[in-house]
Amino acid sequence: MGARRLRVRSQRSRDSSVPTQCNQTECFDPLVRNCVSCELFHTPDTGHTSSLEPGTALQPQEGSALRPDVALLVGAPALLGLILALTLVGLVSLVSWRWRQQLRTASPDTSEGVQQESLENVFVPSSETPHASAPTWPPLKEDADSALPRHSVPVPATELGSTELVTTKTAGPEQ
């Protein structure tokens, strides 16, 4: 019965948020929910990290210049943006340089050939040809008034005296 009482007590102390009472040399650790040596909570005052025992964790110092996670969050995108910008500037300058080189090499040789070619393919419109900016309309038919309109929008049949709206899904009273 004593073992049961201890088991119930230990489960109760794990589930409760109230820390268990510990000795003066021990401190309550909420992670393991048990009393541990208080020396594990404090880092030694010495500046040498090599003298620490393996398995002890260092707490981050408040006097550190720049935390590595902040440097990664800001530095990595900034470096990536700089690399992309330099690549874009390099590509634009390379394309413009190639374009200038092609213009420089092509201009002395083809200046006369371009003029000859452009004069040979000139189209001179006659006086009967309408102006290029004038719209061209199809000729009107003689029987435009008698032809039925070619629209697909359903219209109400008011000319027959009916007041209901004619749609594609409704059937009129004629049917």
Curated annotation (Swiss-Prot):
Which controlled-vocabulary keywords does the entry list? Adaptive immunity, Disulfide bond, Glycoprotein, Immunity, Membrane, Receptor, Signal-anchor, Transmembrane, Transmembrane helix
Q: What is one term from the GO cellular component aspect held by the record?
A: external side of plasma membrane
Q: Does the keyword Membrane apply?
A: yes
| Residue ranges of coiled coil | none
TNFR-Cys repeat extents: 21-38
Localization recorded for this chain is: Membrane
- Which intervals of the chain are annotated as region Disordered? 124-175
Topology in the lipid bilayer: Single-pass type III membrane protein
- The reply on keyword Glycoprotein is yes
Cystine crosslinks: C22-C35, C27-C38
Residue ranges that the UniProt entry lists as topological domain Cytoplasmic = 93-175
Please state the pathology the record ties to this protein: Defects in Tnfrsf13c are a cause of severe B-cell deficiency. B-cell deficient strain A/WySnJ has a 4.7 kb insertion in the BAFFR gene leading to an altered C-terminus. The mutant RNA is not detectable. B-cell lymphopoiesis is normal, but the life span of peripheral B-cells is much reduced.
The record's function comment reads:
B-cell receptor specific for TNFSF13B/TALL1/BAFF/BLyS. Promotes the survival of mature B-cells and the B-cell response.
In Swiss-Prot or TrEMBL terms, this protein is called Tumor necrosis factor receptor superfamily member 13C
From what organism does this protein derive? Mus musculus
The organism's taxonomy opens as: Eukaryota, Metazoa, Chordata, Craniata, Vertebrata
Q: Which gene encodes it?
A: Tnfrsf13c
